[in-house]
Design a protein with these regions (language model features):
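Short N-terminal "domain-start" leader segments
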Residues: 1-27
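Residues at secondary-structure transition points
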Residues: 13, 19, 43-45, 57
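Short linear interaction motif-like sites in intrinsically disordered regions of transcription factors
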Residues: 22, 33-36, 55
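A short, exposed loop/beta-hairpin motif centered on an aromatic-Gly-Thr core
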Residues: 32-46
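Short arginine-rich
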Residues: 39, 53-58
Length: 58
């Protein structure tokens, strides 16, 4: 299965970025400079939290 866009998160600079999550590999991607891998998440909600935390200082 491929990664699916599950929502948008705001960076510390208040810009919106799409978040993708691959439910089979658990990989999380953010649309920052292309699709950037930001780690693994156990659920879609966890993926959104991880993406938001990763983007906070961007």
């Amino acid at each position: 299965m491929s990664a699916t866009i599950i929502g948008k998160v705001k960076s510390g600079g208040r810009k919106d970025y799409d978040v993708k999550w691959d439910s089979s590999s658990k990989e999380v991607y953010v649309s920052w400079g292309g699709w950037t891998g930001v780690g693994k998440a156990s659920s879609a909600a966890d993926a959104m939290r991880r993406a938001e935390a990763w983007l906070y200082n961007k």
